[in-house]
Amino acid sequence: MMYEVKEFSSGKRKLEDYKSIIGEEEVSKIQEKAEKLKGRSFVHVNSTSFGGGVAEILHSLVPLLRSIGIEARWFVIEGPTEFFNVTKTFHNALQGNESLKLTEEMKELYLNVNRENSKFIDLSSFDYVLVHDPQPAALIEFYEKKSPWLWRCHIDLSSPNREFWEFLRRFVEKYDRYIFHLPEYVQPELDRNKAVIMPPSIDPLSEKNVELKQTEILRILERFDVDPEKPIITQVSRFDPWKGIFDVIEIYRKVKEKIPGVQLLLVGVMAHDDPEGWIYFEKTLRKIGEDYDVKVLTNLIGVHAREVNAFQRASDVILQMSIREGFGLTVTEAMWKGKPVIGRAVGGIKFQIVDGETGFLVRDANEAVEKVLYLLKHPEVSKEMGAKAKERVRKNFIITKHMERYLDILNSLGG
């Protein structure tokens, strides 16, 4: 089967654009670290250009790297729907679903698609190769490795289904560095000297995070029939069993018993590499029924980055009730907009939210209900927490910090 491997190049980000956000000293530090790497080629490979945090990061990171003299490129592998069904199974298994079984047919399809894609991208010609997530991880098997290869894992790998992990591990171990969001995601069999801990980031200048005028926010709310005069609870996430969407609906219903006017916004993108998302999307609609105070807002009806931005800014409370979460970029986005987030105490969320200071960490839906009611009844506390949340993002989770960490890794590999 022939695949059309696509190369993506978007935006014209420049490091200087971020000076007002990160300060001149930080800009100079990054420029200094980039000096030895100027003219070097650095290629990223993943499985989708749209939907999900990896694609969002790359849309900003690739042009930003180019602005400091690094020849950054980004390729997206292709495959049939069956391949993405298999890799979604991988995703679920690696995040801890023990009921899933790895068949010989799944292995064969996974390897065949990686092999076919390897014929259309000459990755051996780059100075540094960075492969994102399990989908293209086996690419390393099909090249003569002439330069450092890095594997970036964006999922919660703290307790994987062992059968799937053992299969994937044989490829991961061939990489020169493996990058994880948190130390607990590094499996014990891996060489700790090769492991790097690095949280992902957001781009404050992207359509999803840039400042919006209040008039634009109100126009967007009106377009999607959201009442700005009534309290708004929002969760932004894929339609995925791991995102805890049914818990969010339950939280909203219990809050509504106390505050009848409350509205719930379920905001999400239907991503191209997530066939399972369509099934869960339909289940979500059935769960909601005919409650017109719940809005399901997706790219299918014209919700794109700027609209998501407006919904987050208009919200009184942001939830992230994921059951597993490698690192919740939507949590960081909301925090950057000065919103305290109520999140389940799992994965990267535990690291993002400082409990009681920049938001609340909860164990279950009942705890979340208490915290939602508290924030709705104490807007001054909410505002204070939101200000601290924004500052935490500025110091730790901005795209320029992300890029700086990559520069450190490349320099350590002999840049």
Curated annotation (Swiss-Prot):
What does the entry say about activity and pH? Optimum pH is 5.5. Stable from pH 5 to pH 8.
Q: What is its EC number?
A: 2.4.1.245
Cofactor requirement: Mg(2+)
Q: Name one GO biological process term.
A: glucose metabolic process
The record's annotation in InterPro entries points to:
Glyco_trans_1 (IPR001296), Trehalose_Metab_GTase (IPR052078), Trehalose_synthase_GT (IPR053462), TreT_GT1 (IPR049438)
Q: Which residues form a coiled coil?
A: none
Reactions catalysed, as given in the entry: an NDP-alpha-D-glucose + D-glucose = alpha,alpha-trehalose + a ribonucleoside 5'-diphosphate + H(+)
On the tree of life, the source organism's domain of life is Archaea
Q: How does activity depend on temperature?
A: Not thermostable. Approximately 25% of maximum activity remains after 1 hour incubation at 55 degrees Celsius.
Any GO MF annotation of the entry: trehalose synthase activity
One Pfam annotation, family name?
Glycos_transf_1
Identify the SUPFAM superfamilies for this entry: UDP-Glycosyltransferase/glycogen phosphorylase (SSF53756)
| ATP-binding is among the record's keywords | no
| Assigned keywords, A-Z | Carbohydrate metabolism, Glucose metabolism, Glycosyltransferase, Magnesium, Transferase
Q: Please give the family membership noted in the entry.
A: Belongs to the glycosyltransferase group 1 family. Glycosyltransferase 4 subfamily.
- What is the recorded function of this protein according to its Swiss-Prot or TrEMBL entry? Synthesizes trehalose from ADP-, UDP- or GDP-glucose and glucose.
Q: How does it assemble?
A: Homodimer.
| Name of this chain's protein | Trehalose synthase
